């Protein structure tokens, strides 16, 4: 037989005439995690425990009020209240919307500090004093 003799209609039928079916069902991992939930400045600390790949758990921060600020001169950490977000190199819009990400400059009770942790991944805000 010649290959040109076969009529190939839509992609819903096989050359034998049988129906084409779904190869596999949609897996949860293929759907993705949805839009990013970036931690915001809030009235108090809000954390969420989520199941992640491999059945592990991850503590994510949704809202933050306090940060662990490292004071280089005294070589110690201080739990300080976050007053505001000064700037965010990752995205200038984040500072206006009060999003806290790694690298953001925050104003605390003890002075300005740079966030060194990833709050959305670690569930805690660690920062180093720059003033």
UniProtKB/Swiss-Prot annotation:
Keyword Ribosomal protein attached: yes
Name used for this protein in its record: Small ribosomal subunit protein eS8
Self-association state and partner proteins as the record states: Part of the 30S ribosomal subunit.
One annotated Gene Ontology cellular component of this protein: ribosome
Stretches with biased composition (Basic residues): 16-30
HAMAP family reported in the protein's UniProt record: Ribosomal_eS8
SS bond partners: none
A Gene Ontology BP annotation from the UniProt entry: translation
Superkingdom of origin organism: Archaea
Any matching Pfam family: Ribosomal_S8e
Protein family (similarity comment): Belongs to the eukaryotic ribosomal protein eS8 family.
GO molecular function, one term: structural constituent of ribosome
InterPro entries: Ribosomal_eS8, Ribosomal_eS8_CS, Ribosomal_protein_eS8_arc, Ribosomal_Se8/biogenesis_NSA2
Region (Disordered) residue spans: 1-37
Keyword Transcription: no
Keywords associated with the record: Ribonucleoprotein, Ribosomal protein
PROSITE patterns: RIBOSOMAL_S8E (PS01193)
